[in-house]
Amino acid sequence: MSCSQNKTSVSLAWRECISIASVLIGAYASYKYYKLFKTRDIPRPKEGVEELIGNTPLVKIRSLTKATGVNIYAKLELCNPAGSAKDRVALNIIKTAEELGELVRGEPGWVFEGTSGSTGISIAVVCNALGYRAHISLPDDTSLEKLALLESLGATVNKVKPASIVDPNQYVNAAKKACNELKKSGNGIRAVFADQFENEANWKVHYQTTGPEIAHQTKGNIDAFIAGCGTGGTITGVAKFLKERAKIPCHVVLADPQGSGFYNRVNYGVMYDYVEKEGTRRRHQVDTIVEGIGLNRITHNFHMGEKFIDESIRVNDNQAIRMAKYLSVNDGLFVGSSTAINAVAAIQVAKTLPHGSNIVIIACDSGSRHLSKFWKEAKEIDHDVSLEEVINI
C-alpha cells in the first residue's frame, strides 16, 4: 500500500471515529437532558387556574420530628392557588352544580355561600376562573385580611352579626336566603347555594384527591392522620379513604379548638343527637381566636366520617398561638390558626407512638390571612419560645 493510500485510510478512520464520538456524545447529552427533566417531573402547562388545585406537597416538619423522634409531616394545602384546602371543595361544588345543570359555563351564574373561613376566598377565585360571580355572607368579625381579599377578588360581601345557626340572620342562613331571592326574581340568572357544611361534594373531593395523595406520598406508611373539623369534609374524606379504601390502619385524630363541641362528641358522644343537627338549641359562636375549625353542631359531612375518627384532642388558644410562632421561627412555616392547632395535637399523638412512626397533619392556610387577629397575638410571643412552653400552657 502506498504512503498516500495509507494516509487516506487513516484520515477516513479518524473521521469515522469523530462521527461515532459525535453520535455518542449527542446520545449521551439527549439521555442526560431526558433524565434531568424526567427526574424533575416538570408539570405540563395548565388550561386554567382551576387545574392547579390539588397535588399539594408533603413536607417534614423538622423541628417537631427532631423533638419527638416521630416523623411529622404537613400536607401543604396552603399551596393551592387560592391558598387553602377549600380550593378543592369550591371547585368540586361548582363542577357538581355544572353536572346537574344548575350552572352552565358561559352563562351568567352566581354561587352563594356562608363562611367564616377560607371557603369564600376559594369560591371567589374559582368563580372568577370559570366565569361566575361569588356572593359571600360572613360574620362581621372575620379577619380584615379575608374581607379585603374577598372584596379585591370582586365578590359581593354581606357582613352579618355572629349568631347561632337557628338565627335566620346567621351567615349560612343569610347566604341561603340571598340565593333563594335571586332564584325567585325571575331574571333567568342561575344561582347555587354552595352549602359546604351539608354538601357531599365537600367530603367526596377529599376522598377522591387529598386522601389518595397522602397515601401515595407516604407510600401507605402512615400511623396517624390529624385534622381540624369545621364542615367535617377534610377529616371525613381523608379518613374514609385511608381506612376504608386504602385499608391503612392509621389513628385518626380530630384536633379541636377551645369552645368547640367535637372534642366531647368524639371522645364521649355527648355533643347532641344527629337528629338535632338543624339546630333546635340556641348556641353561641365558638369562643376562640381560631378561624375555620370548631363547631357546636353536627354537619352531614362530619356525620359521614364520624365512625372513622378515633380520638379528639383539645387545644387552647395559647397553645395554638405559641405553636404558630414556634413553627415560624424553627421551620420557616408561616401558618394559620387551624394548622397550629393540628401541630399541637401532633406533639401529643407523637408521645403515644413508637420511634420512627409517621404522622401527617393538614396545613390548611397561611398566616398571612390571620395577621389582624391570630398573628396579632402570635407575633408578640418570644422568639425563643420552647416546645415545652407550647405544650404546657
Curated annotation (Swiss-Prot):
Main location: mitochondrion
Topology class, membrane: Single-pass membrane protein
Cited InterPro entries: Cys_Synth/Cystath_Beta-Synth (IPR050214), P-phosphate_BS (IPR001216), TrpB-like_PALP (IPR001926), TrpB-like_PALP_sf (IPR036052)
Cofactor: pyridoxal 5'-phosphate
Organism domain of life: Eukaryota
Transmembrane segments: 12-31
GO biological process, one term: cysteine biosynthetic process from serine
E.C. code: 2.5.1.47
Keywords: Membrane, Mitochondrion, Mitochondrion outer membrane, Pyridoxal phosphate, Transferase, Transmembrane, Transmembrane helix
Subcellular location(s) per record: Mitochondrion; Mitochondrion outer membrane
Catalytic activity: O-acetyl-L-serine + hydrogen sulfide = L-cysteine + acetate
Modified residues (N6-(pyridoxal phosphate)lysine): 86
SUPFAM superfamilies associated with the record: Tryptophan synthase beta subunit-like PLP-dependent enzymes
Gene Ontology CC terms: cytoplasm; mitochondrial outer membrane; mitochondrion
Family according to the record: Belongs to the cysteine synthase/cystathionine beta-synthase family.
More details: Present with 4650 molecules/cell in log phase SD medium.
Record function comment: Putative cysteine synthase that catalyzes the conversion of O-acetyl-L-serine (OAS) into cysteine, the last step in the cysteine biosynthesis pathway. However, this CS-like protein is unlikely to function in cysteine biosynthesis. It seems that in S.cerevisiae cysteine biosynthesis occurs exclusively through the cystathionine pathway and not via direct incorporation of sulfur into OAS.
Stated name of the protein: Putative mitochondrial cysteine synthase
Taxonomic lineage of the native organism: Eukaryota, Fungi, Dikarya, Ascomycota, Saccharomycotina
Name of the gene: MCY1
